[in-house]
UniProtKB/Swiss-Prot annotation:
Keywords from the UniProt entry: Cytoplasm, Methyltransferase, rRNA processing, S-adenosyl-L-methionine, Transferase
Stated name of the protein: Ribosomal RNA small subunit methyltransferase G
Organism: Paramagnetospirillum magneticum (strain ATCC 700264 / AMB-1) (Magnetospirillum magneticum)
InterPro entries named in the record: rRNA_ssu_MeTfrase_G, SAM-dependent_MTases_sf
Family: Belongs to the methyltransferase superfamily. RNA methyltransferase RsmG family.
SUPFAM superfamilies found in the cross-reference section: S-adenosyl-L-methionine-dependent methyltransferases
């Protein structure tokens, strides 16, 4: 899959596509120096990383004013969503080299973001309307990291693989959530977990 197919599948504008091309070019260049993504995924960058991130954009709640992406790494999905126009995006990443990459992509693509070079646990509550994450941790741990950053009525969009249902079951021991399951556009067995009404404490039978 290439950029033109992304255009067909997602409906992004030509302007956004060109900015994503710049992003992809920078990733390939930086990948030679630091391990931003799995080396075997680079040839399939537009599907494995770009489209995987782009698919979250229509799920962002109407009226959202701030998005926080946890464990941003190479910027998937948070920086891609910022390029597409998501509001007031904060990228949390502990690796300073990856933060340098995120800032360079933001500069070159003229995308306003806030890059936070800290461990998630060290970041003060950010009051996010939407929290995103991909391939970061099991759901119960991920909710523990995300919850302090959720504003009232905030939602989570988590990209998950084939174990998503098991993770939902395990998280129910500690968390109350309303979960929608959206089939992944890039992983036949994967899901986007759209979580609302998140609160700590086992639900009453």
């Amino acid at each position: 899959m290439g950029p033109e197919e992304l255009l067909t599948k997602s409906g992004v504008s030509r302007e956004t596509l060109e900015r994503l091309r710049l992003y992809a070019d920078l990733l390939v260049k930086w990948q030679a120096r630091i391990n931003l993504v799995g080396p075997d995924t680079v040839p399939d960058l537009w599907s494995r990383h770009m489209l995987d991130s782009v698919q979250l954009f229509p799920l962002i709640k109407v009226g959202a004013r701030r998005l926080v992406d946890l464990g941003s790494g190479a910027g998937f999905p948070g920086l891609v969503l910022a390029v597409m126009g998501a509001p007031d995006v904060h990228l949390v990443e502990s690796d300073s080299r990856k933060c340098a990459f995120l800032r360079e992509v933001a500069r070159v693509t003229e995308t306003p973001v806030t890059v936070i070079n800290k461990r998630i646990e060290q970041v003060a509550p950010l009051g996010a309307d939407v929290v995103t994450a991909r391939a970061l941790a099991p759901l119960d741990r991920l909710l523990g990291w995300a919850f302090p950053h959720l504003a009232e009525g905030g939602e989570c969009l988590f990209l998950k693989g084939r174990g998503a249902e098991d993770e939902l079951t395990a998280s129910a021991k500690e968390w109350n959530i309303t979960a929608s399951r959206v089939p992944s556009l890039t992983d036949p067995g994967g899901l986007v977990l759209h979580l609302r009404e998140v609160s700590r404490g086992r639900a009453q039978p």
